[in-house]
Swiss-Prot record:
Biological source species: Mus musculus (Mouse)
Catalytic activities: an N-terminal (5-L-glutamyl)-[peptide] + an alpha-amino acid = 5-L-glutamyl amino acid + an N-terminal L-alpha-aminoacyl-[peptide]; glutathione + H2O = L-cysteinylglycine + L-glutamate; an S-substituted glutathione + H2O = an S-substituted L-cysteinylglycine + L-glutamate
Keyword check for tRNA-binding: no
Protein name: Glutathione hydrolase 6
Alphabetical list of SUPFAM superfamilies matching this protein: N-terminal nucleophile aminohydrolases (Ntn hydrolases) (SSF56235)
Region (Disordered) residue spans: 1-34
Length: 497
């Protein structure tokens, strides 16, 4: 897809407002009833027997009054019943639950999965505010940079895969080659990568996406289980005072952390009009911290057409090199040519000592648009070097020609000829030999005739894995609904509407 493509705009569904039609019908009925009633009263008043003081006229007036009282009471009761009924409640835009309900993880419009509840909630808020899947994904990634510094951050390297249901094109966000700012310190590219993705495909204003992440950094956020566990394992060396108590012990579950210098960087980046300027909002104060000069040449994230592989059931999209996408395509081609896909159990998504620590998220809408993002700072808390003036932890990724084996997102469109075809998105974080694990999981999906219909109240499938690492996220578009298909057991909260 051409990187100069303009912003994507999705059609907004017209909300059904129950009760409007019923109230109009009732007003017409009231007019029909009222008109003959007035005419009949006039006839009574004009009759010869209806004279003042005459007994027949008095009875006629009494009868007319009782009739008017009965009709008025009937109309009032009907109106009260209409207001109390679901159709008469104009404040509700959703059909009654008894008519149209879904199991957890199925949504009419959009859904988001991320490793942190706060960031999934932020993504949902952006979707409800009129944003698209790119807005929600980029906003959630910026949020994770604040609340999950052990796995991602502005110092991370980002890969992404975006499918545009309006055009049918798929685009990859690719990281430039890893470059070192200093020995053991990777050059940060997170801000320019996310700004680039949003500039081409987002809908909401760029500053809007940074408002809540900056507020979380400034006013504080609760330490969740993944961050608390990482702090307990890592210790506090190089992480104080941001992630330590006053006595030097690491913050635990539920403790409140703040990062005001990171908030200042985010607010500065919100004013940037280009990916380059967004990157300099962090890089300029960072090199001052380290006493370095700005590097003359910097890696530039880019948007490229996704790799494609035609399959018997549709087409596969994934990221190009130096991610693990080309290895995934090669494995699928050789496997499909050598045997029929089977539903044999796949080995667990294992994490080894050499597996880079990473963070993944997925956003999807009911039209079929989908964004998968994965980022890494290599080790837990990256280099462990906390920049004093920016509050950012730099990665310790090494400059190497070897592919990023941890980056292997994929999207499968089931049927090229069907405009409402099912879509499957898969992204995994912190896995060893990601291409092999993803290949096995995809082959099992291809061996299934169709997306299984789960019971009405069954939650999404929970896969084994440590929260945030060795974790597979699956999102599906089926029957014009966004589905959260699979999440790791006990973590990766999802939201939608």
């Amino acid at each position: 897809m051409d990187a100069t493509t303009g912003p994507v705009h999705y059609h907004k569904l017209q909300l059904w407002e129950p009760g409007v039609e019923s109230e109009e019908e009732e007003e017409e009925e009231e007019e029909e009833i009222a008109e003959p009633l007035v005419l009949s009263l006039r006839r009574l008043q004009n009759t010869p027997r209806n004279e003042v003081g005459g007994l027949p006229g008095a009875w006629a007036r009494l009868l007319a009054g009782l009739l008017l009282l009965a009709v008025s009471s009937s109309l009032a009761l009907r109106q009260l019943h209409s207001r109390d009924s679901p159709r008469g409640n104009l404040g509700s835009v959703a059909p009654p639950a008894s008519r149209h309900s879904h199991r957890p993880g199925v949504y009419h419009h959009s859904a988001i999965i991320s490793p942190a509840a706060t960031c999934s909630q932020l993504g949902q808020e952006l979707l409800v505010a009129g944003g698209n899947v790119v807005d929600a994904g980029v906003g959630a990634a910026l949020c994770l940079a604040v609340v999950h510094p052990h796995a991602t951050g502005l110092g991370a390297t980002f890969w992404g895969l975006f499918y545009n249901s309006s055009s049918g094109n798929s685009t990859a966000l690719t990281a430039g080659p890893t470059q070192l700012l200093a020995p053991g310190l990777g050059l940060p590219t997170g801000l320019p990568a996310l700004h680039l993705l949003h500039a081409h495909f987002g809908r909401l204003p760029w500053p809007h996406l940074l408002t809540k992440p900056a507020m979380l950094a400034e006013k504080g956020f609760e330490v969740d289980a993944p961050l608390a566990n990482a702090l307990a394992i890592q210790g506090t060396k190089g992480l104080c005072p941001l992630f330590c108590h006053t006595n030097g012990t690491p913050l635990g579950l539920g403790a409140r952390a703040t990062n005001p210098n990171l908030a200042a960087v985010l607010r500065s980046a919100a004013l940037a009009s280009s990916p380059d300027l967004a990157g300099k909002a962090l890089l300029n104060p960072l090199v001052r911290d380290l006493g370095l000069e700005l590097p003359s040449a910097q890696p530039v994230p880019s948007l490229e057409p996704a790799l494609q592989l035609l399959l018997p059931r549709g087409v596969l999209f994934t990221t190009p090199g130096p991610s693990a996408g080309p290895e995934l395509v090669e494995l699928l081609e050789s496997t499909l040519h050598s045997r029929t896909p089977s539903s044999a159990p796949c080995p667990p998504f294992l994490q080894t000592a050499e597996t880079p620590v990473s963070s993944a998220l997925a956003t999807v809408d009911s039209n079929g648009s989908m964004l998968l993002l994965i980022s890494s700072i290599n080790s837990s808390f990256g280099s462990g070097h906390l920049s004093p003036s920016t509050g950012v932890l730099l990665s310790n990724l090494e400059a190497s020609p070897a592919p990023s084996a941890w980056a292997c997102p994929l999207i499968l469109r089931d049927n090229l000829d069907d405009t409402e075809a099912d879509m499957l998105g898969m992204v995994a974080s912190g896995i060893s030999r990601g291409a092999k694990a993803m290949t096995c999981t995809l082959l099992n999906h291809l061996a299934t005739p169709q997306i299984p219909q789960q019971p009405q109240h069954q939650r999404p499938t929970e896969s084994p894995g440590i929260c945030g690492q060795g974790a597979l996220l699956q999102a599906v578009v089926h029957a014009e609904h966004a589905h959260v298909s699979s999440v790791p057991s006990g973590c990766c909260p999802f939201q939608g509407y």
